[in-house]
Amino acid sequence: MQTAEKYGMRDIHFDFESVAPEDREAYNRFLRNVKTRLPNGYTLSTTLVPKTSSNQKGKFFEAHDYKAQGQIVDFVVIMTYDWGWQGGPPMAISPIGPVKEVLQYAKSQMPPQKIMMGQNLYGFDWKLPFKQGNPPAKAISSVAAVALARKYNVPIRYDFTAQAPHFNYFDENGVQHEVWFEDSRSVQSKFNLMKEQGIGGISYWKIGLPFPQNWRLLVENFTITKKG
């Protein structure tokens, strides 16, 4: 609270990942205790992993109680990204179909205005062929991804099912790569989904990666307000 007051912040956010399943109720109690102690004018929010059912198995999922947290906190940020991740095979980072399924489940557990859809500002560059145990894929910004495609003079393709751009190239050592990232088309599809689902807003990971088209489209699609 002292840090929040020092910098004029008004939201206390908890991003606790990989919480043990047996600590699910303890985490809920912790959030209730925090909420009761917050001074007037402060909001409480949390990050949730992407789930599609209340009984979804796996230690990554079980401790995140959508219904309870939807009752306790002022809003949640759902990590609707990393289907394609550094340690897995090449694929879209936030394919539109799975993202929609998560948002629909979240809406069944809490008021839609409390839901913030997570949106990645990054992509990944995988070396091929992919094998478990390979070095992790390299994170790359959207601007850097387009520059890379231009450097190697390769076409950028678009997966209409996932609503995501991607391309392949061979580097100077003859190693083939596969890149998935975000562009204006993929982001617009997410904005359309947000409107369709009637959720509260969007949250980005991570701020600082260059993606100018996103900010232009954000202003074109929504009325941006700044509180405080």
Language-model features and meaning:
Residues 121-190, 219-228:
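Glycan-binding loop/region signatures in secreted carbohydrate-active enzymes
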Residues 21-151:
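Substrate-binding surface in catalytic domains of secreted glycosidases
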Residues 10, 74, 200:
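Receiver (REC) domain switch/active-site residues of two-component response regulators
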Residues 12-18:
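Short acidic, glycine-rich surface-loop motifs adjacent to enzyme active sites
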